[in-house]
Swiss-Prot record:
Keyword Translocase (UniProt): no
Top-level taxonomic group: Eukaryota
Protein name: Alpha-tubulin N-acetyltransferase
Keyword S-adenosyl-L-methionine recorded: no
UniProt-recorded Gene Ontology molecular function terms: tubulin N-acetyltransferase activity
UniProt similarity note: Belongs to the acetyltransferase ATAT1 family.
């Protein structure tokens, strides 16, 4: 998605993590500059959130209405969620464009296993995952998803997915071998059998809670995209 301003000023990294401070700029700025960049960031988040909502067919949205959008800057600002935003810089006359978003956060859930037993848990949940239609089937979704996994220090099978689309479930099966075979959860989250193994280990005291890690993606060199931060080095020429 393209914007009429330089997105790299508001999104300093190839994949930028945004929390409730709405302040990923990582440098000293005067008040006026910070407000301008933050306002541009709000525009990015809200427009990508609206695009995601439309793609998920939640409801029809207009440019004046954010009702139904899972991801908005206002909602992010009053939560403990994290939003990962993937960009591409050397397009749109150098202004760049936003490729996709991925929002995660912990939620207290009651989930049912194969036996019908109910468990209370606090898993990391995928709350919104959207890659712009023009950038799908290019590896961008997996790039964004894997970066989140590493940053949050989480295993895919331990995630809870909020109302995943058929396309998202196919993505999880293709790349991680995960199948939606458990009974349908009343809360519309999809979970996997390995999550119950984790719950049992935690109850028995046999596992330590993982903490998110701090990742800093490199700045891609001119004309090429660097994907060095996933223990891989891939150079993609324009």
């Amino acid at each position: 998605m393209e914007f009429d301003f330089d997105i790299s000023q508001s999104l300093p990294d190839f994949i930028t993590k945004v929390d409730n401070t709405l302040n990923p700029f990582n440098r000293q700025l005067d008040v006026t500059s910070r407000k301008r960049l933050q306002q541009n960031l709000i525009v990015i988040i809200d427009r990508m959130g609206m695009a995601s909502a439309k793609a998920r067919l939640l409801r029809r949205l207009t440019a004046q209405s954010l009702k139904g959008a899972i991801t908005t800057a206002a909602k992010l600002g009053i939560s403990d969620h994290r939003l990962y935003i993937l960009k591409e810089t050397e397009v749109n006359r150098g202004l760049g464009k936003v490729v996709g978003i991925l929002k995660v956060g912990k939620k207290k859930l009651f989930v049912v296993d194969y036996t019908g037993a109910q468990h209370e848990c606090l898993p990391l949940c995928v709350l919104d995952f959207y890659v712009h239609e023009s950038q799908q089937r290019t590896g961008n979704g997996k790039l964004l998803f894997e970066y989140m996994l590493k940053a949050e220090n989480v295993t895919p099978s331990h995630l809870a997915i909020d109302r995943p689309s058929f396309k998202f479930l196919s993505f999880l099966q293709k790349h991680y071998g995960l199948r939606d075979t458990l009974p349908k959860q009343v809360n519309n989250f999809v979970v996997f059998e390995d999550l119950f193994n984790l719950i049992r280990k935690k109850k028995s005291g046999g596992i330590t809670q993982h903490q998110p890690t701090s990742l800093k993606p490199p700045i891609p060199p001119t004309g090429r995209r660097c994907m060095h931060f996933l223990n891989l080095t891939i150079w993609q020429t324009r």
